[in-house]
């Protein structure tokens, strides 16, 4: 009984802390200990997720409010169509029209974790809208609160307005969020290695998923990968090399890319590998032009 009470008290403290962080006047950076969660989540589980049926129905305005475009209003708007009578068993499922933005998301960090890469990329790529995708609830909340605090702390400079985070299962719903050839850069940093052979199907790089990356990444765009697990690195290289829509970027070009240095040093997992004197294996893959047929 005593152990259950301690767990309950800790849970209540976490909930109270997160509720306090959600207040508008809070600019303090969140503390990780109040957002702890398991290191990985099963992507095949039925998570309680909300996702658009089509990218055109995704409303990005809550993530990037400073990029909302005010639509011109007409002096005499047309009357609305008649609304059919509905019963409680027949809810109105008509999708709301998303608020337009001045630009679209062009950079995605798949499995963004606690947001280290997002925060490092934001000021170095001020013209790009950058999105972190994370399946774990508490970790997503941490990144949300982190971005909120950084925006408040840097309000005068207008920093971190171009970065957002979304809870999503990219193994299932990536094309629901992004149109064909929308993304210029995709980062896959220190993904779950799933060491057991029977779990390899859960790896974030596979023949099937690489086709989805090929769909959302524009020709000339880059997929960045990094891991401290050699077996996983070789797996990712093998599967991207085997895909007709990608070619591996040369090591010379790779090392000249400023995003590679950021990817190596700014993610939380990368810093952990550094502390333990581990190796970091990097590979970049360029999206090729589609055949002209």
Swiss-Prot record:
Pfam family, one: Methyltransf_4
Region Disordered: start-end pairs: 1-33, 68-97
Record: residues binding S-adenosyl-L-methionine: 111, 134-135, 169-170, 189, 267-269
Entry EC number(s): 2.1.1.33
Known catalytic reactions: guanosine(46) in tRNA + S-adenosyl-L-methionine = N(7)-methylguanosine(46) in tRNA + S-adenosyl-L-homocysteine
Residues of the active site: 192
Top-level EC class as recorded in UniProt: transferase
Composition skew (Basic and acidic residues), residue ranges: 1-31
Metabolic or biological pathway, per its Swiss-Prot or TrEMBL entry: tRNA modification; N(7)-methylguanine-tRNA biosynthesis
Coiled coil: none
GO cellular component: nucleus; tRNA methyltransferase complex
Keyword set, alphabetical order: Methyltransferase, Nucleus, RNA-binding, S-adenosyl-L-methionine, Transferase, tRNA processing, tRNA-binding
Annotated compartments: Nucleus
Bias (Pro residues) ranges: 75-85
InterPro entries the record matches: SAM-dependent_MTases_sf (IPR029063), Trm8_euk (IPR025763), tRNA_(Gua-N-7)_MeTrfase_Trmb (IPR003358)
One GO MF term: tRNA binding
Function according to Swiss-Prot or TrEMBL: Catalyzes the formation of N(7)-methylguanine at position 46 (m7G46) in tRNA.
Subunit structure: Forms a complex with TRM82.
Family: Belongs to the class I-like SAM-binding methyltransferase superfamily. TrmB family.
NCBIfam families: tRNA (guanosine(46)-N7)-methyltransferase TrmB
Name of this protein: tRNA (guanine-N(7)-)-methyltransferase
């Amino acid at each position: 009984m005593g152990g259950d009470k301690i767990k309950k008290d800790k849970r209540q403290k976490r909930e109270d802390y997160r509720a306090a962080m959600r207040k508008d006047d809070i600019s303090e950076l969140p503390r990780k200990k109040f957002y702890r969660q398991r290191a990985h989540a099963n992507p095949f589980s039925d998570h309680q997720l909300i996702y658009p049926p089509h990218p055109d129905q995704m409303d990005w305005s809550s993530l990037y409010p400073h990029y909302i475009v005010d639509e011109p209003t007409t002096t005499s708007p047309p009357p609305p169509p008649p609304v059919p009578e509905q019963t409680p068993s027949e809810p109105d499922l008509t999708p709301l029209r998303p608020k337009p933005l001045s630009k679209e998301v062009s950079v995605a960090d798949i499995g963004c974790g606690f947001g280290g890469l997002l925060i490092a990329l934001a000021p170095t790529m001020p013209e790009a809208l950058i999105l972190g995708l994370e399946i774990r609830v508490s970790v997503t909340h941490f990144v949300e609160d982190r971005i909120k605090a950084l925006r408040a702390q840097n309000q005068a400079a207008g920093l971190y307005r171009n970065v957002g985070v979304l809870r999503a299962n990219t193994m299932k719903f990536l094309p629901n969020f992004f149109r064909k050839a929308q993304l210029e850069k995709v980062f896959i940093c220190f993904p779950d290695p799933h060491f057991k052979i029977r779990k390899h199907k859960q790896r974030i790089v596979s023949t099937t998923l690489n086709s989805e990356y090929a769909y959302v990444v524009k020709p000339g765009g880059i997929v960045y990968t990094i891991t401290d697990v050699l077996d996983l690195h070789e797996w990712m290289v093998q599967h991207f090399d085997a895909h007709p829509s990608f070619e591996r970027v040369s090591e010379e070009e790779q090392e000249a890319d400023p995003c590679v240095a950021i990817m190596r040093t700014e993610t939380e997992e990368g810093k952990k590998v550094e502390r333990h004197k581990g190796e970091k294996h990097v590979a970049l893959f360029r999206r090729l032009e589609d055949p002209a047929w």
